Amino acid sequence: MHFVKMHGLGNDFVLVNAMTEKVPGDLPGLARRVCHRRFGIGADGLILVLPSEQARLRMRIFNPDGSEPEMCGNGIRCFARYVYETGLAEGEELQVETLAGIIKPRLILEGGRVAGVRVDMGAPHLEREQIPMAGTGSPVLDEPIEVNGETWRGTCVSMGNPHCVFFVEDVTGAPVTTVGPVVEHHPLFPRRTNVEFIQVLNREELRMRVWERGAGETMACGTGACAAAVAGALTGRSNRKVTVHLAAGDLQIEWSPVDNHVYMTGPAVEVFRGDFPLD
């Protein structure tokens, strides 16, 4: 099975053209094999390129544990670059079908080469049942959540997938690996949740660490950065246009007051290509 390894700010993926490659029927099992960092290729996710009846192409993504999230911000930037450079799609603007709906990435070209990708992530969902999250009252702003005997205050947003955002004084020392998995599986979140730990540097800059649903702590999360920007604006901590600093670089996030959509701009990088044995 031919593949391309790519990353968006260290959030890495194995991309496969499932329209031409023979892909096993057990996709969760394939993802677990491929994403394993010792016995496979190693990645935060497996991305499949598929035909679509609703858009130009369809993207499916599977986490290292075999679960299938609705969307992935860093993943769709890699997807957009991959399909453009392999000739599967033409033009700078794409429409991609995902479980979160139609997502619209736009390639940023410099000298004919892809320098980055700007993605229209659509409008954030703030209603509790759309996140989804148990309880009553929307939007969910700084709501107390009991974790390991402590009370954390979370602001919850869906960017097509669920996010719980915690604002902290110092993200470097945040208990991502202990609080993150507990919140991911908290009874409040029937579909589990991604968990962001955010330090507000100023009204235009956020620093982020993330515990991703089904993947653990990763170097970056595009939908998480979008959720963090929305949460910051909703709670008055930051502006609607911010730079989100992650371990390997930055994402530019803008929550437009014009159309209520969130726009994410960042890199997508090819690492290597290869063939993975399926036998």
Swiss-Prot record:
Any single GO CC term annotated in Swiss-Prot or TrEMBL for this entry: cytosol
Pfam families the UniProt entry points to: DAP_epimerase
Stored InterPro entries: DAP_epimerase_AS, DAP_epimerase_DapF
Coiled-coil regions, chain positions: none
Single biological process term from Gene Ontology: lysine biosynthetic process via diaminopimelate
GO molecular function: diaminopimelate epimerase activity
Catalytic activity annotation: (2S,6S)-2,6-diaminopimelate = meso-2,6-diaminopimelate
PROSITE patterns hit by this protein: DAP_EPIMERASE
Active site, per annotation: 72 (proton donor), 221 (proton acceptor)
Site feature: Could be important to modulate the pK values of the two catalytic cysteine residues: 163, 212
Localization: Cytoplasm
Functional pathway: Amino-acid biosynthesis; L-lysine biosynthesis via DAP pathway; DL-2,6-diaminopimelate from LL-2,6-diaminopimelate: step 1/1
Keywords, alphabetical: Amino-acid biosynthesis, Cytoplasm, Isomerase, Lysine biosynthesis
Enzyme class: isomerase
Function according to Swiss-Prot or TrEMBL: Catalyzes the stereoinversion of LL-2,6-diaminopimelate (L,L-DAP) to meso-diaminopimelate (meso-DAP), a precursor of L-lysine and an essential component of the bacterial peptidoglycan.
Family (UniProt): Belongs to the diaminopimelate epimerase family.
Subunit (UniProt): Homodimer.
Protein name per the record: Diaminopimelate epimerase
Species in which this protein is naturally found: Moorella thermoacetica (strain ATCC 39073 / JCM 9320)
